[in-house]
């Protein structure tokens, strides 16, 4: 074999390189210029690739826009002021957080649905019939705004529902023999009223705290007593995961029903009245959240192990086309439907 290329080989090599470059430019130009051709673009563009397996962008788009619709309908139904651009934490907006969580979920759906097919966990005839029924129901019963926003078609919905059914099947297998108990103390939510008295806003906050405590222990309502001193009694549920000062949290959780006490933390005085040491309804909801988090941790760990053997390639450029710039529902849509 010759060590160096001759002139003809060099020309051929340059032609091949040019062709590859042109193809790359053509592929880049396939990206949608407007909403009209986005459905076609998303159908032909892979969002995830794992070996010879892939998931197209339209499936991820469908799942994400459905989630957007759910949140918008929920918040507008209950009259809550709502914006996707609300800052939440560390410079991120509500939209950022929902997109991140949804992206992780979609990636896990992809990995586990492919795992199911590779491990003889395909859907049974009954499960396939259930998918077909759900697809039909979605296409005939969904609000037209959801159909439009998700760019739904029978084929797309069928692909997504098949994937999520396979995902559910694997999740059931993962969770079959694991510990899914929740410590009651981890879930317990007490219901308290807290009066905060900072020396920045109150003269002699320690004396005010003592006076409020004395009045409450004499049978007066903490909210009414607090207003006498131009203070406010904030009524909240407190549990182990509540985002308040740790010392204050521990103090609240130590109180019994109808107990009122004061505590000083870093020069700030707090008067805390406990309505319920265990708000059962809220505790039940907190327990469900902890249970779902525990399930999610097992599933995520399983997916991460699979990814060590078969890494997932992510098309970040394609994912960046998915956002909540266009609402599925507006406040007016929900008001008119009620």
Label each region the model flagged.
Residues 64, 71, 106, 110, ...:
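Sec/Tat-exported extracytoplasmic proteins
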Residues 35-152:
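N-terminal targeting/tethering segments
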Residues 125-127, 235, 261:
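A generic structural-conservation signal
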Residues 79, 215-219, 258:
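Short loop/turn hinge sites at secondary-structure boundaries
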Residues 55, 59-62, 93-102, 106-114, ...:
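Extracytoplasmic/secreted proteins, especially bacterial periplasmic and envelope-associated proteins
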Residues 210-249, 281-282:
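Peptidyl-prolyl cis-trans isomerase
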Residues 122-129, 185, 190, 195, ...:
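Extended intrinsically disordered, low-complexity coil regions enriched in Ser, Thr, Gly, Ala
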Residues 2-5, 9-43, 146-210, 243-338:
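PPIase-associated folding chaperone regions across multiple families
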């Amino acid at each position: 074999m010759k060590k160096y290329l001759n002139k003809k080989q060099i020309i051929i090599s340059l032609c091949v390189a040019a062709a590859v470059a042109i193809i790359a430019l053509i592929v880049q130009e396939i990206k949608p210029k407007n909403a009209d051709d986005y459905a076609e673009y998303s159908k032909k563009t892979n969002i995830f690739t794992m070996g010879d397996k892939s998931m197209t962008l339209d499936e991820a788009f469908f799942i994400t826009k459905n989630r957007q619709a759910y949140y918008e309908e929920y918040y507008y139904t209950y009259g809550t002021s709502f914006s996707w651009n609300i800052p939440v934490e560390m410079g991120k907006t509500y939209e950022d957080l929902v997109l991140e969580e949804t992206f992780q979920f979609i990636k896990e759906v992809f990995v586990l649905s492919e795992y199911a097919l590779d491990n003889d966990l395909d859907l049974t005839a009954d499960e396939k019939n259930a998918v077909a029924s759900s697809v039909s129901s979605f296409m005939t019963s969904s609000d037209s705004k959801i159909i439009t926003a998700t760019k739904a078609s029978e084929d797309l919905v069928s692909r997504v529902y098949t994937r999520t059914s396979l995902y559910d099947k694997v999740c059931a297998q993962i969770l079959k023999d694991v510990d899914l108990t929740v410590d009651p103390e981890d879930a317990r939510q007490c219901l308290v009223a807290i009066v905060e008295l900072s020396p920045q806003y109150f003269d002699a906050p320690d004396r005010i705290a003592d006076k409020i405590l004395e009045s409450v222990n004499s049978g007066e309502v903490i909210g009414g007593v607090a207003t006498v001193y131009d203070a406010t009694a904030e009524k909240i549920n407190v549990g182990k995961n509540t985002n308040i000062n740790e010392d204050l949290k521990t103090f609240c959780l130590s109180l019994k029903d109808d107990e009122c006490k004061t505590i000083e933390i870093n020069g700030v005085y707090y008067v805390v009245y406990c309505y319920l040491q265990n708000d059962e309804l809220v505790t039940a909801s907190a327990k469900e959240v902890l249970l779902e988090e525990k399930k999610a941790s097992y599933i995520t760990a399983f997916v991460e192990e699979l990814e060590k053997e078969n890494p997932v390639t992510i098309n970040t450029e394609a994912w960046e086309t998915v956002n909540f710039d266009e609402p599925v529902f507006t406040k007016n849509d929900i008001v008119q439907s009620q």
